[in-house]
Amino acid sequence: MNEFRERYMSRPTTLLELLAVGLDAEPAIGAPGSTDLTHAGLRSAVAETAAALRAGGLTPADRVAIILPNGPEMAVVFLAVASTATAAPLNPGYKPEEVEFYLTDLGARALIVHDGGDSPAAEVARRLGVAVLPLRPTPEVGAGRFVLDTRALAGPPSDGLPGADDTALVLHTSGTTSRPKIVPLSQRNLAASAANIRASLALTKADRGLNIMPLFHIHGLIAAVLAPLSAGGSVVCTQGFNALRFFGQMEAARPTWYTAVPTMHQAILGRARQNAAVIAACPLRFIRSSSASLPPQVLAELEAAFGAPVVEAYGMTEAAHQMACNPLPPGARKPGSVGLAAGPRVAILDDAGEVAAPGAIGEIVIRGDNVTAGYENNPKANAEAFTNGWFR
C-alpha cells in the first residue's frame, strides 16, 4: 500500500488512485455534529456503493444523476458514483420540468435521491423509466455514511472499472444565452485538476477544509472536496452556506482553509468583527476565492479580519475548475488578477490561430490534462471552442 500511495501521490489518473493516497486512520470526510469518516472508511464506503451499482448492471458509461442536499452524503455519493460510472449531480432546487430536461438530455440510467417519500424528482424519473435509488443517511456510523437501495437497477452485473480516459462527471454549462451544453470530464481531467489545486495551495494531510460550496457545481466538487482528499487531508461538509452559521461551523470544524465565491466572502466579512474571538481561536492558513472576481477592497478587508492571505483563482467547468491561481506568500499576489497558470498550459493565440509572441495581444487559450476533450454531441460548439488543440 505504501508503494501504491507514493506512486500516485504526485499524479493520480483516476479517482480510485486519488482516494488511495490518504492514510487509513486519518480523517477524510467530516460534518457538523458527526464523527469523522477516515480515509479507510471513505474507501470502504466508495467500494461498497460502487460494487452495488455494478451489481445492478451499471458500467462506466452509464449516467447516474444525483439530487441530494449539500452535506457529507452528497460528497461520498459523488465519489462512489464517479469511481465506477458517470456522476451527474443536479441542483436540488430544480423544478420538475427542469429535472425532466436534464434527465432526458443526459440519458440518465438512474437517479439517486434522499429516502423521504416520493419527491417530485423521483416521480419524474419513474415516468421517464429512470431507476430511482433512495438513499438513507446513517450519520451514527460516521459522516457521509448511508444505505443506498439499488433494487430498481435491473442488471446484468457489470465488472468493468473505468480507465483514465473514461468519463467520470458530466455537468451542463449555464445556458444563459443558449441551450446548455454538456461538458464531459474524464477520470484524468478530475484527478489532474485536483492535483493542480493541491499544488497551488500546498495542501497536505494536515489541512482541513470547510466546504460551504454547492456540490452540484465544479468549484465545490473539485476544489473543496477532491483537492484536499488528493493530499490525504480532510473536508468538513456543511449543509450549505449560511452566514449566520459559518462561524459556529468554523469553531466546531477548526479548518485550515475554505474556498468560496465573492458573494459568500462578503457575507462572511459582514459578521467577522462580532466573531473575532472565533477567528483568533481558529486561525486559517489561507482563504481561497474563485468563480467570479473578488473586489480588491473585499480581499484586503478579509485579509485584515482573518489575518490570512486570500488567494484568488480562475476556473471554469470545461477545465475541471482551475486554470490560474495567485501564489501563496511569499509569492506576489495581485488583487483583481487571475494569477499565474496553475496546471494547464496557457497561451495567447494570434488571429491565425497560432501561438503569439511574448507581449502580443490575442486570445487566451488553454490545454492540459484537466481540460475536457469537447462538448457532448455538439460539433458546432467544439469547432468554435477548439483551435489546433487549444481550448478558447
Locations of the language-model features?
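Gly/Ser/Thr-rich phosphate-binding loop
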Residues: 255-260, 269-333, 345-347, 352
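Conserved AMP-binding/adenylation subdomain of ANL enzymes
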Residues: 82, 191-208, 218-256, 267, ...
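Structural core segment of the AMP-binding/adenylate-forming
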Residues: 55-56, 85-161
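Short beta-strand->loop structural element characteristic of the AMP-binding/adenylate-forming
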Residues: 65-67, 74, 78, 82-112, ...
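Conserved pre-ATP/AMP-binding loop-to-beta segment of ANL
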Residues: 25, 139-141, 145-146, 153-172, ...
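Conserved ATP-binding/catalytic segment of the ANL
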Residues: 341, 357-359, 365-392
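Conserved AMP-binding A3 loop
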Residues: 36-40, 168-192
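Conserved AMP-binding/adenylate-forming core of the ANL superfamily
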Residues: 7, 27-71, 75-79, 95-100, ...
